[in-house]
Amino acid sequence: MFIRKNVIKLAIPIMIEQTFVMLLGVFNTMMAGHIGEEAVSAVGMVDSINNIFISVFAALSVGATVVVAQQIGKKDNEKVNETIKQALVSGVILSFTITILMWVFRTGVINLFYGSAEELVKSNAKLYIEFTLFTYPFIATQQIANGILRGCGDVKKPMYVTMFMNIVNVTLGYILIYGIDLNPLGINLQTPSYGITGAAMSIAIARIIGCIIIIRALFKGNEFISMGKIFPFKIDVETQKSIFNIGIPAGVEQLLFNAGKLIVQVFIVTMGTSAIASNAIGMSIASIINVIGNALALSATTLVGQYIGRGDIKGAKSTLLYLTKFATICLFVVGAIFIPIAPWISSMYTQNASVIDISIQLIRSDCLAMVIWPISFVLSAGLKGAGDTRYTMMTAVIGMWIFRIFTGYVLGVVLEFGVLGIWIGMYTDWLVRGTLYCLRLRGTKWLKHKVA
């Protein structure tokens, strides 16, 4: 009962937070879908690029989460506060550097990866990336702050901030994408419609506001956090080493993983605009299906890290096993619900019949594959919480670059199964990685990493 209560107390706020994180992307994709398949294709293409860099920031967040969680387990609050400062400054420097480089090479990047796309799709993609890349520093800062708070067990603040961000994004998104023409009390209210530019503007503003709020919450502190001033800042080599010992392998894993996804996206671009749009819609709906799984994966990182920090090896392993089994049951149920409603939910994104038909195939295949998702992602998150990031990095690289890309290319391009073939390659990757993580869990090497 202790494990169950402990998990539920942490997982429910994270699940609510992840629901709203998911909705942030879903609403943007949905609203872009009603502009046209060119717009939703552009959003999906740019998100594939953005996710490469966002994954780097997420890796820093994982490093901060694990180090803070283990320091909390040791009741070393002084080191917790130093870790927060070091992680935030590193994140800001890294994200500003990436932003500048991406601004310089933005057009070349679009042409390099998506040169075969239709001109209207590419022009929309260039507009969308110009706005979203400027939010990288805000995304990095918010992700690190969220990770730190989760490492402390404070999961409610990220939840509330993400909820508010969604309200801002949906409200501004509707106004900026479609424009309004109202006449309340005889007062004429009109705003122009900005189309895909409006979609980019709304999500950018929401991210900036969310970053400001979460940083303010972090500085207010809690029972573990009492930061004081960041500046004058001095690099603490030992703390940075602890963060990057976790963050670098996690970052390389996510960088190579998302680079692989970008290559897969290039395969899909050659299949035409309908295929690109279907893939974007399918991924958006898959993010809805995965909310519970993502929440339990994030919980695994924090809980395993805290148990390891306390020296409770048995508790770490039993909690990770419980989370994996619980996620499997939950995702099986969610998948069973989404199989019959796939046509209805696809039609919420677009009225294009061919796009809807392909999206239905993708959603239903994803629902069937959900039972193997937890062993690939929840186990991986728990291993990272223990500091076993080098193993998860190598496993993810093997799964992506040998199995997902190769299988996806053969099935999707060579054998002409289309986007569905690409997705079957993704499920093969999940199964291979999950099998390797299960083998790792049976041993004890993953429990022997000293992080904090």
Whereabouts are the PLM-identified features?
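Short alpha-helical transmembrane segments in multi-pass integral membrane proteins
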Residues: M1-I14, V68-T135, P184-I248, V304-A369, ...
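N-terminal transmembrane alpha-helices
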Residues: F2-M30, H34-I35, N51-G63, V92-T99, ...
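Transmembrane helical elements of multi-pass membrane transporters/channels
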Residues: K9-G25, F131, A206-G210, I214, ...
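Transmembrane alpha-helix boundary and packing residues in multipass membrane permease domains
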Residues: I14, Q18, T29-M30, V66, ...
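Residue-level hotspots within pore-lining transmembrane alpha-helices
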Residues: I16, F20, L24, F53, ...
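Helix-terminus/linker motif at the lipid-water interface of multi-pass membrane proteins
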Residues: L23-S41, I110-E119, I175-G179, P184-Y194, ...
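Small-residue-rich hydrophobic transmembrane alpha-helices
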Residues: V40-I100, I139-P158, I276-A342, W373-A396
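Short runs within selected transmembrane alpha-helices of multi-pass transporters and secretion channels
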Residues: S61, F131-R150, P158-N166, A199-I214, ...
